[in-house]
Amino acid sequence: MMVVSWQFLVLSLGIWFLVVARVGAGKDLPDSFEKCHRSDPQFDSCLRSAVNGAIQLLKDGLPEFGIMPLEPLAVDTITINQGGPSAPITLRQHFTGIKLSYLTNSTILKYRTDLKKLIIKAEAITPKIQFAGNYTMDGRILLLPITGKGKANITLHRLKSHHELIGELVERDGGEKFMYIRKYLVHFDPKLVTFDFENLFNGDAALGKTMNQVLNDNWEVVFQELRSAYEDTFGYIFRKISNQIFLKVPMNKIFPE
């Protein structure tokens, strides 16, 4: 299980929606942003292009619309409690002051919408995502005890991600219709994950170097054990963010005819 407290966390898929939500109350999108209409036969292709363009335009933020820089993204805390007595990995981890870097290098490869069923699907590729912050940790990895407190750096290389938003229509006073995201599914598929935990075993340099080597030599096993916790928790976060957007802006403004 993983618990996350966040200040500002947006994945590349949500950037375009975030812009719409921020400027939807009486403002127009900047001319530099691509607009997409449901009547366009190439609507999905337009949205894919719009998201990819917005990623670059918002790298340094958009102060006039109250949008913070997207590079890096900040997360307050993440707590992970993963595994059981018979699991190859049993860990209790707590991270603070987290910075997610290089998300703005993401590229949306596929983008599909079914607005009648209120489903949005996307696939993205990111050359590298770096997760850096302060950590405390104790537990067991592949039968080896592990403990430490210090700086951590976890990097996902050549990450392919799949996103599925499942919504339902809600109507508010005045007849305006909004899309409520009731489920957000995420799947991460990195080609490599590297770990660097400083100050393991109370600063024992030799043991720390050995444990980091074990983690990196067995990254697939380690990531596989932690994957569901990451995916479930980030899906929860992204659903919460999406609903803060979709429940503020009517569908006909997010997806104009």
Predicted regions and their residues:
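Extended amphipathic ligand-handling, pore-lining, and cofactor/metal-binding catalytic surfaces
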Residues: V170, K177-F234
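Short, charged/polar low-complexity linear motifs in solvent-exposed/disordered segments
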Residues: G139-R140, E198, K240-S242
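Hydrophobic-cavity lipid-handling domains and compact docking modules
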Residues: G26-K191
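C-terminal helix/juxtamembrane-tail motif
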Residues: V3-V4, D28, Y236-E257
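Residue-level signal for alpha-helical context at structural boundaries
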Residues: P72, D76, K149, I181, ...
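Sec/Tat-exported extracytoplasmic proteins
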Residues: V51-L58, L62, G66, L215-W219, ...
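Cleavable N-terminal signal peptides of Sec/SRP-targeted secreted and luminal proteins
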Residues: V4-A25
